[in-house]
Amino acid sequence: MSPDKATALTNSPLLNFVKELSGRRIEQARRRNGITQVQFAREIGISRRWLQEIESGNPSSRLDFHVVCAEHLQLKTGYIFFPFLFRGHQMEFPRELTYGDFDEIERECIDLIVRRNLSRMKQKLTPRWWSQQRTEGA
């Protein structure tokens, strides 16, 4: 990727929005758990200053650190990934969705993925003779 393209990606309004939203959620969860910035930064192996950058939603913060922080605080990460799912399909992400709880949406997505893949796996793993036995027994 060219440096110009990388710079354009880091200046993306969507990416900046996600980092800002993520930073707020990380800070809220950390405070709710009664963990100081110093403690949390030490736990995940970064400096307190870098954690401040993440929590403030600084555009220069790395998204992978947002994911590490969210996972460490046991936050679900749909709010990070769903906006990019929309973008990947050339759709604008409705920011109103970020005000709600993603739990149900995340579970429905997981359920859909599991159902589709279980069905396909079942077809692949079902021996041909099982269908022949059913036909012969009928």
Regions found by a protein language model. Name each.
Residues 24-43, 67-68, 95-104:
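Short basic helix-loop element that most often maps to the first helix and adjoining turn
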Residues 58-63, 89-91:
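Short, solvent-exposed alpha-helical "recognition" segments
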Residues 38, 49, 78:
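Key DNA-contact positions within bacterial/archaeal DNA-binding proteins
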Residues 7-8, 81-121, 129:
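Short, charged recognition helix plus adjacent turn
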Residues 45, 64-80:
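DNA major-groove recognition helix of helix-turn-helix/homeodomain DNA-binding modules
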Residues 2-32:
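A short, Lys/Arg-rich alpha-helix, primarily the initiator
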Residues 44-61:
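Recognition helix of helix-turn-helix/homeodomain-like DNA-binding domains
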